[in-house]
Amino acid sequence: MTKEVIVESFELDHTIVKAPYVRLISEEFGPKGDRITNFDVRLVQPNQNSIETAGLHTIEHLLAKLIRQRIDGMIDCSPFGCRTGFHLIMWGKHSSTDIAKVIKSSLEEIATGITWEDVPGTTLESCGNYKDHSLFAAKEWAQLIIDQGISDDPFSRHVI
């Protein structure tokens, strides 16, 4: 017997969201009461744009480090297959506003302060596709997203 499963992100109407934004997807509790929060960190407007793989890959590696420097509890930050943003999984209770501030600060550092030497995991030994990176593209996208402003509401522009 096949279990009926609803995947929340496929239920979201991608035509009415207004990127860039941070959206709380879900808050779940483990068997011992541990809280996990899942965020939609949408950097570009769905079905209108996407970040090319090399730039997104470099942003992914940088966010893995920069988010952890700014807030406790990060489990994982993984890119969407559609290349419009990331799932951010966190331990504990966090608000969309708190996460939007962390993302904004991280993107500001990518746009203005990061050099190639700062990008973690760019060697054959540390990355499964180490040749597919672009700091230039990561910086360009980060600045574009900052210029648009990051909202803590996916449906109306409430820029933090």
Curated annotation (Swiss-Prot):
GO term, biological process aspect, one: quorum sensing
Swiss-Prot/TrEMBL catalytic activity: S-(5-deoxy-D-ribos-5-yl)-L-homocysteine = (S)-4,5-dihydroxypentane-2,3-dione + L-homocysteine
Alphabetized Pfam families for the sequence: LuxS
Record-listed Fe cation binding positions: H57, H61, C127
EC numbers: 4.4.1.21
InterPro entries in the cross-refs: LuxS_sf, Metalloenz_LuxS/M16, S-ribosylhomocysteinase
Cofactor: Fe cation
Gene3D superfamilies (UniProt xref): S-ribosylhomocysteinase (LuxS) (3.30.1360.80)
Cofactor binding remark: Binds 1 Fe cation per subunit.
SUPFAM superfamilies xrefs: LuxS/MPP-like metallohydrolase
Signal peptide (residue range): none
Record's keyword terms, sorted: Autoinducer synthesis, Iron, Lyase, Metal-binding, Quorum sensing
Protein's UniProt keywords contain Lyase: yes
Molecular function terms, GO-annotated: iron ion binding; S-ribosylhomocysteine lyase activity
Assembly information from the UniProt record: Homodimer.
Entries under PANTHER family matching the protein: S-RIBOSYLHOMOCYSTEINE LYASE
Family the entry assigns: Belongs to the LuxS family.
Known role: Involved in the synthesis of autoinducer 2 (AI-2) which is secreted by bacteria and is used to communicate both the cell density and the metabolic potential of the environment. The regulation of gene expression in response to changes in cell density is called quorum sensing. Catalyzes the transformation of S-ribosylhomocysteine (RHC) to homocysteine (HC) and 4,5-dihydroxy-2,3-pentadione (DPD).
Annotated protein name in UniProt: S-ribosylhomocysteine lyase
Organism encoding this protein: Streptococcus pyogenes serotype M1
